[in-house]
């Protein structure tokens, strides 16, 4: 450009408009919907010669987070889509960018693509991710679809190759966050290489534009701050230092411009220019004056030159219009600029170090601003969604709140939430955790295939089944049980039953509860090798065959992982359908996969609505949701901090009666995920609330409340606990379908808590040990026809007592009262008592175990777990063996008054249950746990009544 000729052009009297006479384009560093809509932006174009617009997260945060400009669009979007805060922000931002681009398009046409651009920034979270930056740049470019768009990419070492790549693909880019000459040189080189690659491929390069955003005032902010400190301290070079105030940033910019002039004069560039290439102009950014002792237009007046852009904040824009002075300042006193840079180096002001620091701080600042922006959007979103989201409220002691907040701030600063979604194992132990995170994606995946489940539901209904009997254990059964207990029998569909026991009486009870001729059996086993579902399948397959008088395969469905033994069995036996799980989802995280959805669909649950409810929690917990707006992350932080900092590791689950069974599912999730390596969260489910005085200082209460169906007694008790200073997290569900949200909410929270506990929440190393011991015993039975003999260390009436040598020695050889008194006498503050009953789980035995546990709690002032075996082996058993050594266990076994054969096996259900109990106890003993087994001889009901009486006396 012939600057001298331009400078001779007529002046308008408006310094902003007249910048073009010097070859400089004024852009506005500001965007706001109302500003564009009311014509204010167009007025700047018409009256001030505005040539472009830049945006950044801080600008959008101010625009979107406050006022009502965006409310109508937010309401409309949320009425039609389930979005994460990041997705919602992007849709809002793209609307703004497109509207702004249309206002600026006449400038784009008039200047033949030199100006008229509006910039949209890639996520600052990707500043150090080359592939992520390039992918997002392409995605945003396509999403906006305006030719006068520039994608903003940071000039970090990782951002520069992404910039080169997308330039070669025809995308116009604003490279931002440049402070040093070296960084600028790398960016300009990348631009030229990108053009050369595209040109060599025979592609048009004339429609690509780029600017290099060179930040100015932030440099003086750092340098001048250092100067002022040294002068105040009496530095010997005080006068020389003071002479550099307000000069280093401008000198740095002038030297960068000299490099631009050299490159654009080179033969290499001229070849590209001849092919239609546009030069990458320098754009002066951060040009608002922060030091009030300087002119408020300093960084505009001193940086005027040909082929440059100055993106100006609104206040500075107005100030320059009012009193800006024009001259070709960028090429003035260039030698002095070099001298200034030499002088700062001699004086030890370390411009190189300052620019490196500014890049680091700039990336962090952009991330902070993006956090605030997404937080503001998330707050708006939560307001408009209201009760469509489950609501969480934490009443915490001040010290626990501070500890949880510290965890959340760490997650925010380090981006652990984004790392979690990226399946980065460094969030936990750096092991193979990343291989077990498909549960993060399963809701979207199942929604994409929900028509298959809906078709299955229609077929089940059409076949007229009266019952669905699911045969499974642990993660394959507990989620479906929640669905069965919460929704009951749905009109027009079969009743869902869930059997997860080897107790022969319980198996028989379930057999009697269904019409074998008219029942759909769902055999659910991820691995296909789990003992219980395999023998249950064998039993009911034979029973159904007998009832039907023919091969019953068409009454059976399998849910299993691809390639499993169960898949082979299902094919061999002619099962009606096989539904597949996802190998990279552990059982306890599988409820929103086919393991939960297939039985739900068979029972008539609206699986589409169920999954859509779950999706709300997925989006609320997304990678784009800051910790302050992420309730599931907050829950995980609270649980983790409570356990690690305050010894509050007993997570006491209270649920409204209508959703009571959520606690049973949560037990497995928490215990198996966290109870290992001597630490963990010990879930306490279904323990009726007591007065505050019966609790120790080791509890965190999780209150799952169904709005409109809250229990008055629970409400009163929870209020008393809060008043007493106990930590209570209340989670409100507006509708029963929202248990789907609760499922994901707790899965995510558990993953976060696992990180705080510094364990792998996706393995279960101690579950296998009980299986191994059980296998030894059943193998011995198959070989000899009997289990290996065992001898009680004491007998008292109908009770036989068993223990390893260490426990037996500690308990003595007295009567039942003395032994139980000694056993429970070992309980101390911070412990919990586990009552582990290998008996039929029915209304009577559940009432019995509740009465026993509450007596133990109230007398010993410790948490209590009331479990039925072998069900709990696939649930809380992991924590009892691998978690903290704070459990005192009473295992209860009993004579079976009747037994059931297992088709194809020598052992019976009763033998399997006995082997499981003994295997479980052997592992508890091997781990040095305080454990006692009492075996009841004779009638069970009478024996239980007597045991309850003795326990009451013992404590």
Residue ranges: model-predicted function:
Residues 455-625, 707-709, 716-723, 729-731, ...:
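Glycine-rich phosphate-binding loops that contact phosphosugars or nucleotide phosphates
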Residues 277-381:
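Flexible, acidic glycine-rich loops studded with aromatic residues
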Residues 59-62, 66-161:
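Active-site beta->alpha loop and helix N-cap motifs at the rims of alpha/beta catalytic domains
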Residues 546-701, 707-712, 741, 745-862, ...:
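Active-site phosphate/pyrophosphate-binding segments
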Residues 163, 171-315:
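Catalytic alpha/beta core domains of metabolic enzymes, predominantly
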Residues 56, 120, 151, 166, ...:
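Conserved, mostly hydrophobic/aromatic
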Residues 2-39:
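N- or domain-start disorder-to-order transition segments that initiate the globular core
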Residues 386-462, 708, 716-717, 753-756, ...:
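Extended, charge-enriched "interface" segments that sit outside catalytic cores
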